[in-house]
């Protein structure tokens, strides 16, 4: 029946992962302290994205951009994404997890405890999981400490783990 289908769908991990966490105030944000905020969609890291990042950052190391040499000489038998490309995708992946409303603005504050676990091989798909590790009210400014993990599809070890810090200026 349609009700059973809806019930099963709404309980599935895939459906839950597609739902954004919506936050409208500091108090709502604080209510997630220590709790998971969600999981982004999978995102493919292809050679075009890697080449564009290499051009933007002037980092054209062969392990990232020389497909033929990587096939012949790299232990991965493929090019790999720049570690900082994986990090640079964090804002996009974060936006897929959380929607923060009633803002004047949001500012990236910093990163802590960042570790690259393993390289992202070209053509791999990544996604991010996040939870609120800490939160502070700094005279009306919300400082959120987000514990994140960027995982690689089919791999046990993550590509990147760390703590992102954002300042949210609520209206």
Where are the regions a protein language model picked out?
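Short alpha-helix capping/helix-loop boundary micro-motifs
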Residues: 111-116
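Alpha-helix capping at helix-to-loop junctions
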Residues: 95-99, 119, 135
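N-terminal amphipathic/basic-hydrophobic helices that include classical n-h-c signal peptides
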Residues: 1-18
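HotDog/MaoC-like acyl-thioester-processing domains
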Residues: 18-32, 120-171
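Generic alpha-helix initiation/capping and coil-helix boundary signal
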Residues: 1-2, 47, 157
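Hot-dog-fold acyl-thioester-processing enzymes
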Residues: 19-108
């Amino acid at each position: 029946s349609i009700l059973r289908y809806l019930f099963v769908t709404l309980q599935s991990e895939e459906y839950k992962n597609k739902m954004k966490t919506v936050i409208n105030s500091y108090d709502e944000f604080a209510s997630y302290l220590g709790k998971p905020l969600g999981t982004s969609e999978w995102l493919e890291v292809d050679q075009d994205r890697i080449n564009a990042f290499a051009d933007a950052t002037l980092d054209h190391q062969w392990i990232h951009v020389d497909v033929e040499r990587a096939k012949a000489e790299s232990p991965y038998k493929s090019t790999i994404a720049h570690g900082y490309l994986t990090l640079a995708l964090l804002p996009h992946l974060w936006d897929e997890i959380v929607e923060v409303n009633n803002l004047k603005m949001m500012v990236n504050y910093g990163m802590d405890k960042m570790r690259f676990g393993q390289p992202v091989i070209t053509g791999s798909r990544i996604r991010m999981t996040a939870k609120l590790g800490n939160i502070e009210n700094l005279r009306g400014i919300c400082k959120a400490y987000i514990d994140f993990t960027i995982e690689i599809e089919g791999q046990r070890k993550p590509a990147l783990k760390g703590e992102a810090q954002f300042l949210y200026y609520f209206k």
